[in-house]
Amino acid sequence: MGKPYINNAVIGNGSMLGCITESGELIRLYWPEIDYPQHIEKMLTGFFGFNNNTGTIWFSEGDHEITQRYVEKTNILETSAVLQKLNLSVTQTDFCLPDSPVMVRRYYVKNTGEDNIHLGIGLASHVISNEIDIGCSMFDFYLDALVHYRHDCCWAITSDIEVREFQIGNNPFGAVWERKLNGIDSIGMSPDGALLWDMGILQPGAETGLTLHMTFSTSLNELKKTALDIKQMSFDELYGITKRYWNNFFSGFINTFTGNERIDRIYERSLMLFKLMSDKKTGGILASPETDEGFTQCGRYAYCWCRDAAFITRAFDEAGMYRETERFYEWARNVQDIEGFWHQRYFMNGNVAPSWGIQIDETGAILFGILDHFNYVNDIDFLKRMWSAVEKAADFLIRFIDEETGLPCPSFDLWEERMGEHTYSTAAVIAGLRAASEIGRRLGVSDEKTQKWLKAADSIREALEKELVDKTTGLFLRSVRTKLNPWGAEPSSNTVWITVNSKGYSRDVTLADSRLDISLIGPSVPFGVFEYDHAVVEKTAKKIEDALYCSKAGGIYRYEDDSYAGGNPWIVSTLWLALYHIEAGNVQKAADYFKWAVKCATHLYLLPEQADKNDGKACWVIPLTWSHAMYILVLKGLMKKAGKHIFDNI
């Protein structure tokens, strides 16, 4: 079954993550990690009258009038629908308990018609299944619940009202549609099943409700214990626990109040999203909930990139989420390759995720980020715990040098598209080596080692100015020795053959790529290799602004001729330029870009990866953790430079 690409809303608790569409359908549910495994193939809830012939009306399908909101300052989601054919108003409330492997779903139903209705509610559920890990189902009479189970996981759908009918397999979705389930088999090698409840007679104007609990465990006996405990608690108790948790969540962090409701709501939503995207068990940071399991449009998103995390952890620190930052760097220390570098991307459990090449900027960014966090918290014990990782990474970076150019060896760029020797990656390596040297100095490490790293950083900086600045235009080149066509011969005659690994394999590469790219801001912001007023930085930033601005919808494209997902302006690239303008003292220009990003947020105050180039509406990945991080960084930067009055006209 195909899934929508857009996750309109997310709920969770750091070990469970649920993704919900704008119509309220739960399309993805992860546990015990926020990236794996995903359990939901399909789940629908239907409403019907036993005493009429209207048929079953699916809550999340059809042309219902739908509204959706988060309960203020919580990750509790409410989706309301008007089911006109049944004269019902239904509100679905979804949340995950803060400290239990349980998702709660509550239906409030009101009869808005003039006639009685004998109300029935049916639920059909299909668990993920494959030939390696067969999904099976049973009806557990002890729990009065539908139970799905696989190799290392089981989960139950229990309720606060007794189940009237159930069915295992044999097209349970169709059975709910027909309003009659066949429970003659209570267990089977089938990934799907259904439940049906008799809600009784609902008079005009009357209300009723049904609470569902989706409880997870690694064993059936433990599942039964937990599910029974949850069933004994009322919905009001469960709701109250969750609401208090999220309301208290903000007390330990830095409050930022601008007086602009939309700006402040996005800030609050960003912090709550950060909590959901930070894995409770490991500390890994999820780039985004998955959108494309089938690799039909992209390389997938439900992984941890160290590059994104270096920006995200700075946003954590700006918001006072210091423990989340520290847990990430502890995770990074644990997953570091024995050679000293970090791979392209990881699962939350620390295993290497599907990848296609090292991206050396990520190793530099981790070192930069470790020192950056220390500058916020001044915790020397943190540096001591990180030292072994810092030392291995810095030593790797000074070995990873192209002897002919003096730049870091070819690796993939930050957009993961081109192999080459890139300006952004080079700046990240310089910043990383400088950070490692400073960390060593702070820890009293011998000057010989720290000076070796610092000398290497200075040498690479000289190579950057020599090799990666276009002498004709005075602009940064995006890359040299770069593979513009990964599938065949290069599209230019300005090429050279280079050896790509120690086994002697070689390929042709283009000598220079002069395309403008927002990452060319990187040598100044965030890495500080050059000051904002350095001649090449200033000229490149001006050219980027002129060439990459989207005249129709606003915002900044990633780079010239970007075609990914339609080629739209990105939140990250737009706010990156805003950060540069904050450094340069152009606070009003930065505020203008920030205003654009504020407009791009969804009605649930979530920020996408991109905004449509024609109408500026949020598109593609929602939410993107990196986008929210950049939002925090620009917001804080504007507050520091100009005060909250800068937001008066946003």
State what each model feature region is.
Residues 255-267, 282, 316-329, 373-391, ...:
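Structural helix-adjacent loops and short alpha-helical linkers that scaffold large soluble proteins
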Residues 158-165, 422-426, 451-572:
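Extended ligand-binding clefts on enzyme/binding-domain cores
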Residues 62-76, 256-297:
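Conserved oxyanion/phosphate-binding beta-strand-loop segments in alpha/beta enzyme cores
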Residues 1-50, 301, 312, 347, ...:
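C-terminal capping/lid segments that line or modulate ligand- or cofactor-binding pockets
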Residues 288-298, 342-358, 403-421, 498-505, ...:
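Acidic/His metal-coordination segments adjacent to aromatic residues that form catalytic metal sites
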Residues 1-262, 318, 640, 644-648:
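Terminal accessory carbohydrate-recognition/targeting modules of carbohydrate-active enzymes
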Residues 257-283, 332, 336-341, 354-355, ...:
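Active-site acid/base region of carbohydrate-active enzymes
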Residues 110-111, 301-404, 426, 430-433, ...:
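Aromatic-rich carbohydrate-recognition surfaces in CAZymes
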